[in-house]
Amino acid sequence: MSFKKVSFAAVAAVCLFLGGCTQPRTTQIELPKSALDSVNLPNEVAIAGEKFILKQKNARTAEYYLPNEKVGFKWTKLVSITVDENADINEYQRTFMTALKSGQFGKAEYDFKSINDKEYQAYTIYYPIAGNPDFDNYEINLIHVKSLNCGLRVTHYALKFLNIADRSKFHALIKQKMPIFLAQMPQVECK
């Protein structure tokens, strides 16, 4: 018998013995509930005349990409919806602002504007990070955060610009796009 066959047989026997694979189990493993299960998510979103398709989601965040763009960092425009069942809106804002001020996400400009005690709007302008191919462009995020009965809903509309873009035009663009985003963002509500 070859060494590979003997090694495999020994490893398999140890796994069966130590893993208890020889006896059937009746224990059910229940996966954690997704925060997104508590809201009605659309499959498509339209903002500024462009259609975004739900292409990726995890337990807390759904990402919508343009039809011809792939999941990952090479998108040009992106819509995302995050639901956090346990977040406090004020603590969320403080934590986000602290991270921005610290430079955790690289150099950034930002502004937060309270709408009322249950919602606010914000924008971020992230600067390119030299040498990082995933973050080598400017990125503008228009953000709306609202406290719902089922958790905190955070909606982002993100736009990327080449690292040679004229930064002086970003604030005018934000002023133009923010009302469109707020009027057309998906109205995701609790189930």
Locate each region found by the language model.
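Bacterial N-terminal signal peptides that target proteins for export
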Residues: 1-10
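C-terminal motif of bacterial Sec signal peptides marking the signal peptidase cleavage site
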Residues: 18-20
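N-terminal "mature-domain start" segment
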Residues: 25-64
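Short secondary-structure junctions
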Residues: 44-57, 100-115
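Secretory pathway targeting signatures of secreted, lumenal, and periplasmic proteins
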Residues: 48-88
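Short, solvent-exposed recognition patches
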Residues: 82-108
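Signature of long, low-cysteine stretches enriched in small and polar/charged residues
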Residues: 104-146
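Surface-exposed amphipathic alpha-helical segments
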Residues: 151-191
